[in-house]
């Protein structure tokens, strides 16, 4: 019988060249090829899109309005499709309420666990809060030694101010003879006058007994009487012993701290029943940050040390500041840091109740006199932020504020009541601070009573199962309370992967986009095993991937190419990895078999004395490390996932340099000092954030080449005759653009119960410009034709205009020759956006004093693309600039001049320097995981060179 398969015929999405392919079902299929070759077009835009469309089409119109309608992909037929699930990197929630625990649903089970077997404790007295029946109280008292004398007391006043005369009188009228007031037994008729300004505790003596058999009935009656008098509280005064406290309700018998019935919603920070009332469950509050208010403490007040009060059109605040300094004799020409602590406190937090009189010039002209209490700069910013009706003022004030942990819940997000419930010795706020590996260990060994164990058994099974899946995809270092908005694309994707395995679905088609991103080679095996486990459940996996190990582990490998863009879109080779390796036409096969490779450089640039020195870096999990980053060479920062690479490079290095060089308001991670910044004049962070958030932004506008192209069109004879200036050829301003679509080229049509539909503008036919503008041509092409050209085509078209050719060539050099000049920024992948940014920096003149910071540069890149990119980075270094890269890819690591390896583990087990030096030095370091894999690569490359 023929093996089941997915048969695709006539796929033409994007650059696909009418391809036919048969893919085996229930196998691990890896699709690879150059960046832009058409992998995603086949995997996501054809196979997944059709699988999803068919599923959605089977639903009712009502259900479809929530799921969105998908267009039919440009393909003749696809047979053998299963329901499709896509796990990509773009759907990370930026909601501050979303955490690793909530996304994976682990938190739902933890909440249930605390609601079912949690034990509430009084936060003031650290005693367990229990609700007890009268029978339980009797049993506990009868456990006392025989002949023990006891008094049953009803606490009617607990530590409250007042003389309480009326209450004492009422107790006497009810027939009670004795009271215990502040620990002393007194007759109800001889109570001394109580000081109404002091706290008092008054307890009614309900009964006096000797513990012996046969008193149970009398004891129960007396307990009931006491509980009625004191609203459910009872104190047993054991003569010559310690008092026993009992409570009929969930309340502390000493202070009355009460807690309602334990429910799962009580432990949710997204519910008003559980959230901290101060921060509404966010764990953080926007607070004025003194370091942003006074960013440069070497400045004097006259030089503008207090940044929010630097003079503007009104001199209200500068005049007030001057008057305050006169009154309190503060020298305005003294550096802020040299002022006394008292003087700084007055300026920042106010002068108390003392009123200050001053005269200031109004914005409209004229002077005005004011008398007011000086509130201080910090309270002033906070007040204006919270009370101002002006959006502009609030935005300006927010620049001087930062998110700090909430002072009530200390960042734990929950109410005091929720944090008073314990399971296995920890409250829920403490548990979610654990990393996944710590939490897994904790729940596997949790100590519960036999009864609680029986109740919690099924819940614990679910928690342990989900934690195990997360652990198996290399995420053991993530803490459960980590905000999902701070996760990298690869981490977010692996979390969704773990969630899918947890669902144990079978017969599903999963389409994944580079799940190995951000994963160290050490953790790759676990990821591959996870993928195989999903396959073994009876699912088909299509993985778009460039990672060597994943390609070798595939059951079926598809190489798409041979080039990118117009030069791609064909199946170059398909079959087992061994078959593809033998195929001479397959570029991927050549690299996999070692016939082609990225060579180790013949020499490495030595680390010079010029360096940036970071001392005492403590951001996130960094353990107060000292690091030197040599200048004018290529440094790669390595380490297992979660070892502290991003904390060091992005949080400490980049943000501190941005603060000093660019005068940025970002707040760096914690460190003691950084030296050597004066050797740099420019810092460029090339990350994967979009180059623009609107369809109007594109590679041509971002790199600035579109300005030069518009200049060329404005210089043509036709444009001069018509009097067209450069602005005529912009689609962002009135004049040359099509006014029907405002230069977008597309028009949005609202479909109400269906998703919005975008259709080409009928007036300009999607060209963005009006007819008159399009009549102006250069070498037979109008401005709209230029935007539809690929970068490669445009480079040839403008080869005689050096200024334009140089900028376009940099895009080709970074492997973006296949992208069209007018491609909407919103449709570029993270890796493509990153390379557009790199290209726009490349054509700028180098000062030799720039530092480039790149994070996971190889995302979405084939080995051949990486080879080209390394040449570009080396060009930057040859100019004297510094390149710092966070990277796991061994081809990049082996070509570095200098490596900083962090670790040894992830999360709390990381944050230290494992090794520094050349790749050869790291390869010899036995404690380095990176060194272990690097050694294999260097030896393999050496062997291949000798074989040749």
Curated annotation (Swiss-Prot):
Listed GO MF terms: ATP binding; ATP hydrolysis activity; DNA binding; excinuclease ABC activity; zinc ion binding
GO BP, sorted A to Z: nucleotide-excision repair; SOS response
Zinc finger (C4-type): 252-279, 738-764
InterPro entries found in the cross-reference section: ABC_transporter-like_ATP-bd, ABC_transporter-like_CS, P-loop_NTPase, UvrA, UvrA_DNA-bd, UvrA_inter
Residue ranges occupied by any ABC transporter domain in the UniProt entry: 309-587, 607-935
Cited Pfam families: UvrA_DNA-bind, UvrA_inter
SUPFAM superfamilies reported in the protein's UniProt record: P-loop containing nucleoside triphosphate hydrolases
Residues binding ATP, per UniProt: 33-40, 639-646
Residues forming coiled coils: none
The keyword Glycoprotein is assigned to this record: no
Subcellular locations according to the entry: Cytoplasm
Alphabetical UniProt keywords: ATP-binding, Cytoplasm, DNA damage, DNA excision, DNA repair, DNA-binding, Excision nuclease, Metal-binding, Nucleotide-binding, Repeat, SOS response, Zinc, Zinc-finger
PROSITE patterns tied to this protein: ABC_TRANSPORTER_1 (PS00211), ABC_TRANSPORTER_2 (PS50893)
GO CC terms: cytoplasm; excinuclease repair complex
Function, in words: The UvrABC repair system catalyzes the recognition and processing of DNA lesions. UvrA is an ATPase and a DNA-binding protein. A damage recognition complex composed of 2 UvrA and 2 UvrB subunits scans DNA for abnormalities. When the presence of a lesion has been verified by UvrB, the UvrA molecules dissociate.
Family named by the database record: Belongs to the ABC transporter superfamily. UvrA family.
Subunit and partners: Forms a heterotetramer with UvrB during the search for lesions.
Protein known as: UvrABC system protein A
Gene source species: Staphylococcus aureus (strain Mu50 / ATCC 700699)
Lineage, broadest ranks: Bacteria, Bacillati, Bacillota, Bacilli, Bacillales
Gene: uvrA
């Amino acid at each position: 019988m023929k093996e089941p398969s997915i048969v695709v015929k006539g796929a033409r999405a994007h650059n696909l060249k009418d391809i036919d392919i048969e893919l085996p079902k229930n196998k691990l299929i890896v699709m690879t090829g150059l960046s832009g070759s058409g992998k995603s077009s086949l995997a996501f835009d054809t196979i997944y899109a059709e699988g999803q469309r068919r599923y959605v089409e089977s639903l009712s119109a009502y259900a479809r309005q929530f799921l969105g309608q998908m267009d039919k992909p440009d393909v003749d037929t696809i047979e053998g499709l299963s329901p499709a699930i896509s796990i990509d990197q773009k759907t990370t929630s930026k909601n501050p309420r979303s955490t690793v625990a909530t996304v994976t649903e682990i938190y739902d089970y933890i909440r249930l666990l605390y609601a079912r077997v949690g034990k509430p404790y009084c936060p003031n007295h650290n005693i367990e809060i229990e609700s007890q029946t009268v029978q339980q109280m009797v049993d506990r008292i009868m456990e006392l030694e025989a002949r023990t004398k006891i008094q049953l007391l009803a606490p009617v006043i607990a530590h409250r101010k007042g003389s309480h005369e009326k209450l004492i009188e009422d107790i006497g009228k009810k027939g009670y003879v004795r009271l215990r007031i502040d620990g002393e037994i007194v007759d109800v008729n001889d109570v001394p006058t109580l000081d109404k300004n002091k706290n008092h505790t008054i307890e009614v003596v309900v009964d006096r007994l000797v513990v012996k058999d046969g008193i149970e009935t009398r004891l129960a009656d007396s307990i009931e009487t006491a509980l009625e008098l004191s609203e459910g509280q009872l104190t047993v005064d054991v003569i010559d012993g310690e008092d026993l406290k009992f409570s009929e309700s969930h309340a502390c018998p000493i202070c009355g701290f009460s807690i309602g019935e334990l429910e799962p919603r009580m432990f949710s920070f997204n519910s008003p029943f559980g959230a901290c009332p101060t921060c509404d469950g966010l764990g953080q509050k926007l607070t004025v940050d003194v370091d942003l208010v006074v960013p440069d403490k070497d400045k004097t007040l006259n030089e503008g040390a207090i940044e929010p009060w630097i003079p503007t059109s009104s001199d209200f605040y500068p005049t007030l500041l001057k008057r305050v300094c006169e009154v309190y004799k503060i020298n305005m020409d003294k550096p802020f840091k040299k002022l006394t602590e008292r003087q700084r406190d007055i300026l920042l937090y106010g002068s108390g109740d003392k009123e200050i009189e001053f005269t200031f010039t109004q914005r409209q002209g004229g002077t005005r006199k004011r008398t007011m209490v000086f509130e201080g700069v910090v309270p002033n910013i906070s007040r204006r932020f919270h009370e101002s009706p002006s959006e502009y003022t609030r935005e300006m004030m927010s620049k001087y504020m930062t998110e700090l942990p909430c002072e009530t819940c200390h960042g734990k997000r929950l109410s005091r009541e929720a944090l008073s419930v314990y399971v296995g010795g920890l409250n829920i706020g403490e548990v979610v601070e654990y990393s996944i590996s710590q939490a897994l260990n904790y729940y596997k060994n949790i100590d519960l009573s036999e009864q609680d164990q029986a109740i919690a058994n099924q819940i614990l099974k679910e928690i342990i199962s989900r934690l195990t899946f997360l652990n198996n995809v290399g995420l053991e270092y993530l803490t459960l309370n980590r905000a999902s908005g701070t996760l990298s694309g690869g981490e977010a994707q692996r979390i969704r992967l773990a969630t899918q395995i947890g669902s144990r679905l079978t017969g599903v088609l999963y389409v994944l986009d580079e799940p190995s991103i951000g994963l160290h080679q050490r953790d790759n095996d676990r990821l591959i095993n996870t993928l195989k486990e999903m396959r073994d459940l009876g699912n088909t996996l299509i993985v778009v991937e460039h990672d060597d190990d994943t390609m070798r582990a595939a059951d079926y490998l598809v190489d798409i190419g041979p080039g990118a863009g117009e030069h791609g879109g064909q199946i170059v080779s398909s079959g087992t990895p061994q078959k593809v390796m033998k195929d001479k036409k397959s570029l991927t096969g050549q690299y996999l078999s070692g016939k082609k490779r990225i060579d180790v450089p013949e020499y490495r640039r030595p680390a010079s004395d010029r360096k940036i020195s970071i001392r005492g870096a403590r951001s996130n999990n960094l353990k107060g490390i000292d690091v030197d980053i040599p200048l004018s060479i290529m440094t790669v920062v390595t380490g297992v996932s979660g070892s502290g690479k991003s904390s060091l490079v992005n949080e400490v290095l980049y943000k501190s340099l941005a603060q000093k060089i660019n005068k940025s308001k970002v707040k760096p991670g914690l460190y003691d000092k950084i030296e050597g910044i004066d050797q740099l004049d420019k810092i460029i962070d090339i990350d994967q954030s979009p180059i623009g958030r609107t369809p109007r932004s594109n590679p041509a506008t971002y790199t600035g080449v579109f300005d030069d192209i518009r200049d060329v069109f404005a210089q043509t004879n036709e444009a001069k005759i018509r009097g067209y200036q450069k602005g005529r050829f912009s689609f962002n301003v009135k004049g040359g653009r099509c006014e029907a679509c405002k230069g977008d080229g597309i028009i949005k049509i609202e479909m109400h119960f269906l998703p919005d539909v975008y259709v080409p503008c009928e007036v300009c036919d999607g060209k963005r410009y009006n007819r008159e503008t399009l009549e102006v041509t250069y070498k037979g092409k109008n401005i709209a034709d230029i935007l539809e050209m690929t970068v490669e085509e445009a480079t040839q078209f403008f080869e005689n205009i050096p200024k334009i050719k140089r900028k376009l060539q940099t895009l080709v050099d970074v492997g973006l020759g296949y992208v069209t000049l007018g491609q909407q920024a919103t449709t570029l992948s993270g890796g493509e956006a990153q390379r557009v940014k790199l290209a726009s920096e490349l054509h700028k003149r180098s000062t030799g004093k720039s530092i480039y910071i790149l994070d996971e540069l190889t995302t979405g890149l084939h080995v051949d693309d990486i080879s080209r990119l390394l040449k570009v980075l080396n060009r930057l270094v040859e100019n004297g600039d510094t390149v710092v890269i966070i990277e796991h890819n061994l081809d990049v690591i082996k070509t570095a001049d200098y490596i900083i390896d962090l670790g040894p583990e992830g999360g709390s087990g990381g944050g230290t320097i494992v090794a520094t030096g050349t790749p050869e030095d790291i390869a010899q370091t036995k404690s380095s995981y990176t060194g272990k894999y690097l050694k294999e690569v260097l030896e393999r490359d050496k062997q291949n060179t000798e074989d040749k």
